[in-house]
Design a protein with these regions (language model features):
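Long, low-complexity, charged/polar intrinsically disordered regions in eukaryotic proteins
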Residues: 1-16
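Acidic/polar residues at beta-strand termini and the immediately following turn/coil
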Residues: 14, 21-22
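Long, charge-rich, low-complexity alpha-helical segments
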Residues: 17, 25-112, 121-125, 172
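Short strand-coil-strand connectors
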Residues: 23-25, 196
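Secondary-structure boundary elements
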Residues: 87-157, 161-170, 194-195, 199-201, ...
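Short, well-structured beta-strand/strand-turn elements
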Residues: 172-185
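A short, glycine/Asx- and small/polar-enriched loop/turn
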Residues: 186-190
Length: 216
């Protein structure tokens, strides 16, 4: 039986396990070993039985009609911004300027304020467009942020850190992708920023263990 993911619900199949993210309820659901009876292609679900389809609809994870949310599209992270920046000659590295300090402080305050809102309200609107390859200007502004970051009075888990950096980079005119991903056995959820195939705030080698479930 053909179904569609409900509005605000995202999913990924990892081996034989299906993981759902319900954005409105800020909750993950894992259905282990269901891969043989449940297929996923984009936002289209294929259930092998009417009973399974009805259970997914009753749980709010699936719907009998499609919605306008775009299907997940993203590149796997192949490069790490940190490594690229550290390979630059000292004369090529960017020292923070006043605009970097102002941008970072404003981003930190905005991210602290965002913590008071529900998870769904912290996310930008969904878009099928992906960020382009990291430009030299983006890398220079990221390099400046990495230099001043130890002095900022802000810290937190990956959601806060990636949101802070996203606010900072977008405030300086850059487009980035906010990747939300999961792994199983053991289950873990993680998020990071990416431009093209470059991870901006994490190590690409570490991120290959995660499977993207949502991109904003």
């Amino acid at each position: 039986m053909g179904l569609w993911l409900s509005a605000g619900v995202h999913a990924v199949v990892i081996d034989q396990d299906a993981v759902f993210l319900d954005v409105d309820n800020n909750a993950y659901f894992c259905l282990p070993g269901i891969g043989e009876v449940l297929g996923l292609e984009g936002r289209v679900l294929t259930a092998s039985s009417d009973a399974l389809a009805e259970d997914l609809i009753a749980a709010g994870l699936a719907a009998a009609t499609p919605n306008a949310e775009p299907a997940l599209t993203t590149q796997p992270p192949l490069r790490t911004a940190r490594a690229v920046l550290e390979d630059l000659a000292p004369t090529e590295r960017r020292r923070p300027r006043m605009r970097h300090w102002r941008g970072a402080i404003a981003a930190g305050l905005a991210s602290r304020l965002a913590e008071q809102r529900p998870f769904a309200a912290r996310l930008p609107p969904a878009s099928g467009l992906r960020a382009p390859v990291a430009s030299p200007r983006l890398l220079a502004d990221l390099d400046a942020f990495r230099s001043l970051q130890p002095w900022l009075p802000f810290d937190g888990a990956c959601l806060f850190r990636s949101q802070l950096l996203r606010h900072y980079l977008m405030g300086l005119g850059h487009q980035v992708d906010w990747i939300f991903a999961v792994r199983t056995w053991p289950f873990a959820a993680h998020c990071w920023l990416q431009a093209g195939d470059m991870a901006l705030d994490d190590e690409a080698e570490r991120l290959v263990a995660y499977h993207p479930i949502m991109v904003r």
